[in-house]
UniProtKB/Swiss-Prot annotation:
Cleaves peptides in various proteins in a process that requires ATP hydrolysis. Has a chymotrypsin-like activity. Plays a major role in the degradation of misfolded proteins. The keyword Hydrolase applies. It catalyses: Hydrolysis of proteins to small peptides in the presence of ATP and magnesium. alpha-casein is the usual test substrate. In the absence of ATP, only oligopeptides shorter than five residues are hydrolyzed (such as succinyl-Leu-Tyr-|-NHMec, and Leu-Tyr-Leu-|-Tyr-Trp, in which cleavage of the -Tyr-|-Leu- and -Tyr-|-Trp bonds also occurs). GO terms for molecular function: ATP-dependent peptidase activity; ATPase binding; serine-type endopeptidase activity. It comes from Shewanella halifaxensis (strain HAW-EB4). SUPFAM superfamilies: ClpP/crotonase. GO terms for cellular component: cytoplasm; endopeptidase Clp complex. GO terms for biological process: protein quality control for misfolded or incompletely synthesized proteins. Belongs to the peptidase S14 family. It is found in: Cytoplasm. InterPro entries: ClpP (IPR001907), ClpP/crotonase-like_dom_sf (IPR029045), ClpP/TepA (IPR023562), ClpP_His_AS (IPR033135), ClpP_Ser_AS (IPR018215). This is ATP-dependent Clp protease proteolytic subunit. Keywords: Cytoplasm, Hydrolase, Protease, Serine protease. The gene is clpP. The active site is at S107, H132.
């Protein structure tokens, strides 16, 4: 499938013009929403995206350490290490990070959704959530393959333990339910404990 060049995609980002005492000021829509403490995590979770998310989290903490941050997630998942960089920063900073699933939160996206502040994790009504075990592939000598297999198993156990803590589900239930791709509706995700509520309108 033909992929639009990045320059074209950037040109499609809406601009917002604000009137200030010093005149007009224009922002791209994401920068304007960042002023409202809204961060978007959209697409594949990878290192560059993770660095941008982490930087925004740290910036908003420095601006107002006592005000909530809102992380909107629409992601099919991606790199575990990149995702953990975001997750650890969410737990590290002082502000509560409220997570909201729009569209989908799958794999590492679902993990980050569940990692939001307790009582402040939400799904929109028609969003989808999917959990599963980490994926990995490696080629090389048999001894190196064995090392990587052990690493993946270790990551799997760690993620399952953390997911059990965030959802309140027993570890053995998490292990069973992540053995294969496990898709949930917004309501099912709330019942499972991945989020705290399904929201259709702002209160």
């Amino acid at each position: 499938m033909h992929k639009a060049p990045e320059s074209v995609l950037n040109a499609l980002v809406p601009m917002v013009v604000e009137q200030t005492a010093k005149g007009e000021r224009s922002y791209d829509i994401y920068s304007r929403l960042l002023k409202e403490r809204v961060i978007f995590l959209v697409g594949q979770v990878e290192e560059h995206m993770a660095n941008l998310i982490v930087a925004q989290l740290l910036f908003l903490e420095s601006e107002s350490p006592d005000k909530d941050i809102y992380l909107y997630i629409n992601s099919p998942g991606g790199s575990v290490t990149a995702g953990m960089a975001i997750y650890d920063t969410m737990q590290f900073i002082k502000p509560n990070v409220s997570t909201v699933c729009i569209g989908q939160a799958a794999s590492m996206g679902a993990f980050l959704l569940a990692g939001g502040a307790e009582g402040k994790r939400h799904c929109l009504p028609n969003s989808r959530v999917m959990i599963h075990q980490p994926l990995g592939g490696f080629q090389g000598q048999a001894s190196d393959i064995a090392i990587h297999a052990q690493e993946i198993l270790g990551i799997k156990n760690k993620l399952n333990t953390m997911l059990a803590e965030h959802t309140g589900q027993p570890l053995e239930v998490i292990e069973r339910d992540t053995d294969r791709d496990n898709f949930m509706s917004a309501t099912e995700a709330a019942e499972y404990g991945l989020v705290d509520s399904v929201i259709a309108k702002r209160s």
